[in-house]
Amino acid sequence: MIEGIILKGLLEICCGSFEDVKTAWQNGADRVELNSALYLGGLTPSTANLICAKEQCSIPIITMVRPRGGGFCYSQDEYETMLLDARILLEHGADGIAFGFLTADHAIHRNRTQEMIDLIHSAGKEAVFHRAFDCVAQQERAVEALISLGADRILTSGGAPDVWSGRTQLQKLQSQYLSLIHISEP
């Protein structure tokens, strides 16, 4: 399954497999986000899918790090697994990592987010906070937290189920924080 968005002339496609990445690349995608289980909102892809995609496609590949569906508040074991997944994916050529950590009260989990961003940036890659952002209680506060933590990009539909429904909030966030962080549609 392939879903796409256009960001200021940049076509990014959300892909669920190596085959999807190859199809997106052959059809003009500028960048892809590699996942598995898109029907669950996207989960961590296998390292083999990333390796095959990097060997055969010449576009940037952002990989999702998410161990399960069902929310963005993780146990310590899940969190440690996510850091290891990110490290392995970066070692195998991921151009960035899409991730999201929330607290039980629907705020950005600052410590975990900072540690993940530091790991990603230590590899010189892009830190993308994914649609966990759509579950936060206070979006402006969340954007400011992500800016202060050093996130490079936020994927959001403005807190709504889809971009069209959240377009007013999305446009507000984009205009308010345009010079500080890239906020894009999933």
Predicted regions and their residues:
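Conserved beta-strand positions in the central sheet of alpha/beta enzyme cores
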Residues: 12-14, 31-33, 62, 98, ...
